[in-house]
Design a protein with these regions (language model features):
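C-terminal helical/coil "lid" or tail adjacent to the Rossmann-like core of SAM-dependent
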Residues: 3-4, 206-262
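Conserved alpha-helix/loop element of class I SAM-dependent methyltransferases that forms part
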Residues: 20-37, 53
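Short catalytic micro-motifs in class I SAM-dependent methyltransferases
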Residues: 112-113
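A short glycine-rich, Lys/Arg-flanked "PGG" loop and its adjoining helix->strand segment in the class I
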Residues: 122-134
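Conserved catalytic/acceptor-binding region of the Class I
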Residues: 139-214
Length: 282
């Protein structure tokens, strides 16, 4: 099996992927907390980078928890935190099917996860509101790529690859997604107003701060590893199995060309939301 396909199927290499996007936003997100929490729960904690950053920022943290669906990423998180001398309780769990916990937290965070919960984000919002201390803070990030014909963010690169591989004409790409039963990222990332409507059913939104997030890579190979670790085989239904490796190579070349032409692969607005539980929810 080709190494990049094996990586995509296992979602390995996230430690390198997070260096390109998530870690650079870590301080920006934690800056929005506005409190010095004694307890923190990170939802979709990945390899534990935000937990590690929080432990260093707030040395008086008494309870540090993380929940992650991927067993591989949980093991990597345990190793990273253990190596830094940080004690944390890490649980395996599906964010859309979490059991109730006895604990409540002063700070609950969730970064670079929301789009994977579509269209059931409210299940998580409801759960988070019920596990937040009365005066606690819920921080999460959302991405809002420009979406043409419903295709945005990573969809744009995938669409270009499909066209270059002769698998779809430009005007047929959206239809190809529909035929494959695959939701584009441009659909998974709700518009800010539509998202706010759902958030405000469970929280008071204190603030929303946004900035552009540019993806930059050194070369084609680095982009392929990023795509494999971040999206796995999500887009595989669009491509014949015998051409999946070719698709990764094509994506890498497109990313490299964009770097040469624009100095970046893509740019997507990202927002960090600071929320508090509504009365009766916490």
């Amino acid at each position: 099996m080709n190494a990049i396909i094996e990586q995509a199927r296992s979602l390995d290499g996230y430690q390198d992927s997070s260096e390109l996007l998530q870690r650079r936003d870590q301080d920006w997100v934690l800056d929005r907390a506005g409190i010095e929490p004694r307890s923190l729960l990170d939802l979709g904690c990945g390899i534990g980078s935000l937990l590690l950053g929080a432990a260093r920022r707030w040395p008086d943290l008494q309870r540090l928890w993380g929940i992650e669906r991927s067993p591989l990423r949980l093991e990597q998180a345990r190793a990273q935190l253990r190596g830094a001398g940080v004690e944390a309780r890490l649980l395996e769990g599906d964010l859309l099917d979490l059991p109730p916990l006895a604990e409540r937290f002063e700070l609950i965070s969730m970064t670079a996860v929301l789009h994977w919960l579509y269209p059931d984000e409210e299940r998580l919002f409801r759960w988070a509101a019920r596990h937040l201390e009365a005066q606690g803070v819920f921080l999460f990030t959302s991405h809002h790529p420009f979406a043409e014909d419903g295709l945005g963010g990573e969809d744009d690169l995938v669409a270009q690859a499909l066209v270059e591989m002769g698998l779809a004409a430009p005007e047929r790409v959206a239809a190809l997604y529909a035929e494959a039963g695959l939701l584009p990222m441009g659909t998974r990332t709700r518009g800010r107003e539509a998202l706010r409507e759902r958030v405000e059913r469970h929280f008071r939104v204190d603030s929303i701060v946004s900035r552009p997030a540019a993806l930059r890579v050194a070369d084609s190979a680095e982009y392929q590893r990023f795509h494999a670790a971040t999206f796995g085989t999500y887009f595989a239904p669009l491509v014949p199995a015998t051409r999946l490796e070719e698709c990764f190579v094509r994506l890498g070349r497109i990313a490299e060309r964009r770097m040469q032409a624009d100095g970046q692969v893509s740019e997507i607005p990202v927002s960090v939301w600071r929320c508090r539980a509504r009365e009766g929810e916490a």
